[in-house]
Every structure is written in C-alpha cells, then in structure tokens.
Design a protein with these regions (language model features):
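Hydrophobic "lid"/C-terminal helical patch
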Residues: 64, 94-98, 134, 192-199
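Amphipathic terminal alpha-helices
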Residues: 176-178, 187-202
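Residue-level signal for the nucleotide or nucleotide-sugar donor/cofactor binding architecture
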Residues: 24, 82-85, 125, 172, ...
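NAD(P)-dependent short-chain dehydrogenase/reductase
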Residues: 36-96
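Catalytic helix-loop patch of NAD(P)-dependent Rossmann-fold dehydrogenases
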Residues: 4-47, 51-52
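Mid/C-terminal beta-alpha module of Rossmann-like enzyme folds, strongest
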Residues: 93-94, 100-161
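Active-site loop of classical SDR/Rossmann-like NAD(P)-dependent oxidoreductases
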Residues: 153-174, 187
Length: 202
C-alpha cells in the first residue's frame, strides 16, 4: 500500500494506528484495498511504503538523472518530505518476513504477527534534496550532465501544481515492523547509492 492513505498534515512519522485520510483517488483506492483484505477475514501482511525507486521502471531518481543530462536547471519541490525507498529493500524485507513465517511453522496459528506494517528506508528528505543527491552521485561518477547539484532549485508545492494532491508529509514510522521482526532498515542514501551505481555503470 502507500503513504497516500494519509493527508500529510501530521508532524512526525505516521504510525499504523493513525487515522487515514486520503486526498486523492489513488490513495482512496489503496485504502479500499486494505479494508477489503481485512474484511475478507484472510490472514495477511500489508506493507505501506513510499517514494519507491529502482534501477528498472519509471521513477523519480531515473527521471532526475535523465533531466539533468538534458537541462541546465531543474526546479524541484522542497516542502514535501518522505523516505526514498528502493524496490530492492521492499523485496528483501518481504523475503525476510516470509522467511520468518515459514521457519516458525505457524502458518495455521493466530500467533504469527499478521497485519499492517509501514516499510520505508530510514531517514527523511525532501524531493529537492533527493534530486540533488541523484545529481551529486552522477557527478561523482563522472556522468556527463548539463547541470550540477547547485542548479537544482527549490520550489514550493504551490509553484508546482498537480492534478492530484500529494501529502506534504509522507514519513512513515517503521517501529512496529522493526520491533516485531527484528529488522534494521538502512538509510535511504544507501539504497540510492546502490541504484545509482547500477544506473551509471549500465
């Protein structure tokens, strides 16, 4: 699921117990999916995540890398915050949790901690700082670009209107996930460094 089930008005990270209030059709459909799964009575694990990126498919990091090679300046929103989360981290955590499920052999037991969890990388940043980090990594790898990190300009959400509103705060608290399954989630920069290495050497 997604951070878009929240309206983004909270200070600090959202927990699984915070009341959802989606502001877009996308967020509403994700929340409806969560509710349908719960009401079905099926044992389940639902992971809410945010700002997903990877070496494959369309995502913010790849878009910034492409635009940095085409333009001499970029304007990126600086008043929306979250944790860029790599697809690899989501896959790894999912595999670890399912591995614990299999090893515990509690497939038919109510004791296994099924339910809703927040799964994002550690740390917090803005879209603007995220974009600067992408450009900086490309520069360090000697990728030919038309701009540098200082050419990535900060703007407000009001200066970049979109048809569907995005939460100003997409930070998700992962305490429940980490404590329940004994996980240590890496900082978002670690995942970005790995993906940038893939993109810049391919």
């Amino acid at each position: 699921s997604t951070d878009y089930v929240f309206d983004g008005s909270k200070d600090g990270g959202y927990t699984e117990d915070d009341a959802p209030n989606p502001q877009s059709v996308y967020g509403k459909t994700k929340l409806a999916g969560e509710a349908a799964l719960i009401t079905s009575g099926a044992r389940h694990l639902t992971f809410r995540t945010s700002w997903v990126f990877g070496a494959h498919g369309a995502n913010f990091a790849k878009t910034m890398l492409r635009l940095a090679a085409e333009r001499r300046s970029l304007k990126v929103v600086a008043d929306q915050f979250g944790a860029p989360t790599s697809a690899a981290l989501i896959a790894d955590v999912t595999a670890q949790v399912l591995g614990q499920y299999i090893q515990s052999r509690r497939a038919t037991s109510a004791e296994f901690p099924y339910g809703l969890y927040h799964l994002v990388a550690a740390g917090r940043t803005s879209w603007h700082e995220y974009a600067r980090a992408v450009v900086q990594a490309a520069h360090l790898a000697n990728k030919p670009l038309k701009l540098g990190p200082d050419d990535v300009q900060a703007i407000t959400t009001a200066e970049y209107p979109l048809p569907a509103p995005r939460p100003a705060n997409s930070c998700l608290d992962t305490t429940r996930l980490r404590e329940t399954f004994g996980l240590c989630l890496p900082d978002w920069r670690q995942g970005l460094d790995h993906v940038m290495t893939q993109l810049l050497t391919s």
